[in-house]
């Protein structure tokens, strides 16, 4: 048996009268910003016959770039930006020729930290010289300042502001 308390339980209903009820927050789905980006991509497809595109500048062997290339593909495609795959580039001249042939304005470097340390600066400079707006998949770490100096404009990584990065990419690519 539960003992009876002599203290009355408080009434959960508001007392008094001078208190104002706050308006409720609007209902918003977390996917809405991504849906808006994909809708803008659909509009571009209907208008010009092609979606916005990013060139994946995959450096090194398949095992070097696969993780970040898949991350970058999913990252950009979540915002309606096509990210066609490729087998990677061991030669910078071949990468630049493939970038030019792709018709993309945006290029994203994809590889391992080891390959980034060896090749990312030169690749970023070459892509920038070829007319690319260069992004890099992954956190830049100690290479951030030299990468930015070499032409990298943005970094796509887990924990970054995905929506603002994709919106900036849409702006670069002329997606309205």
Q: Where in the sequence are the language-model features?
A:
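Peripheral docking tails and interdomain loops at the edges
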Residues: 125-176
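Residue-level marker for beta-strand->alpha-helix junctions and adjacent short loops that shape enzyme
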Residues: 61, 114-115, 141, 162
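Internal alpha/beta domain cores that form substrate/cofactor-binding pockets in large enzymes
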Residues: 84, 118-119, 127-132
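Short, low-complexity intrinsically disordered segments enriched in A/P/G/S/L with frequent Arg
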Residues: 13-19
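Non-catalytic terminal/interface segments that mediate subunit docking, oligomerization
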Residues: 1-8, 19-114
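Active-site-adjacent beta->alpha loops and helix N-cap segments on the catalytic face
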Residues: 92, 115-125, 165
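Residue-level marker for well-ordered alpha-helical positions
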Residues: 70, 93, 121, 141-142
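Generic hydrophobic alpha-helical segments
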Residues: 95-99, 123, 169
């Amino acid at each position: 048996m539960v003992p009876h308390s002599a203290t009355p339980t408080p009434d959960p209903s508001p007392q008094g009268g001078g208190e104002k009820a706050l308006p409720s927050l609007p209902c918003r789905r977390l996917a809405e910003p991504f849906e808006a980006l994909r809708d803008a991509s659909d509009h571009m497809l209907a208008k010009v016959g092609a979606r916005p595109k990013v060139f994946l500048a995959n450096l090194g062997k398949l095992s070097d770039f696969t993780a970040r290339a898949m991350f970058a593909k999913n990252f950009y495609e979540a915002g309606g930006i096509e990210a066609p795959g490729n087998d990677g580039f061991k030669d910078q001249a071949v990468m630049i020729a493939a970038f030019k042939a792709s018709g993309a304005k945006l290029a994203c470097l994809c590889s391992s930290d080891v390959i980034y340390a060896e090749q990312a600066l030169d690749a970023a400079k070459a892509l920038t010289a070829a007319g690319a707006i260069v992004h890099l998949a992954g956190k830049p770490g100690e290479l951030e300042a030299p990468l930015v100096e070499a032409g990298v404009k943005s970094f796509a990584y887990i924990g970054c502001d995905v929506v603002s990065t994709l919106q900036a990419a849409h702006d670069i690519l002329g997606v309205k």
